[in-house]
Amino acid sequence: MCNVVSVTAKPLCKDDFLQKIQKISDSDTQYIILREKYFSEQEYFNLVKNVLSVCDKDKLIIHNFPETAVKLGVKKIHLPFGAFKDLKGREDFDLLGTSVHSTEDAIFAEENGADYITAGNIFETDCKKGLKGKGVNFLRNVCDSVNIPVYAIGGINADTAKELKSVNRKNFAGVCVMSLLMQSENINEEVMKIKRELG
């Protein structure tokens, strides 16, 4: 069964953010990527400290701030592709991921130590209105270009997840979901719906 990874976006969350994180942590998600891209590093550091009080540390992936991860003892990090290329201190992390938008990016990421990649955007998303999705064939091509796990990102919900069944690649590891889980009242129900559709 494919995995579901939650990607956070505090502005989309209408409820108490820490309560939402706790519910996501308690759900059948594999990881939570704490992606708050409008935060300064100090704001982000403070947020992570609070999140660690409600979230399973093994599920938490820090986004974009390696020094914060090291200071707080979080061993998983996800970096935008540009930051991934500049990373010093790969040995500080047990899990390193990056975002790719082409097969060339994917190959570079694998050759330079990424443990997994997110590939997208697969479908049109709420946060990038008007940006056409790259589609299922793009995802299949990315999977074929590398051996590491690949997660689809962009416009994923139970309906679009149905279309991903046809990817049919061993290293297709699952999906990353943002808007849906940030706004959902029934987080685990949504997660399980997506997992059922992915098969």
Q: Model-derived features: where do they sit?
A:
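Glycine/Thr-rich beta-alpha phosphate-binding loop at enzyme active sites
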Residues: 71-72, 76, 81-83, 97-144, ...
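Alpha-helix-loop-beta-strand connector modules within alpha/beta enzyme cores
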Residues: 45-62, 84, 90-102, 130-157, ...
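Glycine-rich phosphate-binding active-site loops on the catalytic face of alpha/beta enzymes
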Residues: 6, 79-89, 118-130, 161, ...
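Short secondary-structure boundary segments
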Residues: 10, 36, 81, 100-102, ...
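N-terminal active-site wall of soluble small-molecule enzyme domains
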Residues: 25, 29-90
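Active-site mouth loops of central-metabolism enzymes
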Residues: 1-18, 94-100
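Alpha/beta enzyme core
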Residues: 16-31, 67, 72, 82, ...
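Structural preference for beta-strand elements that scaffold enzyme active sites
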Residues: 3-5, 30-33, 59-61, 75-78, ...
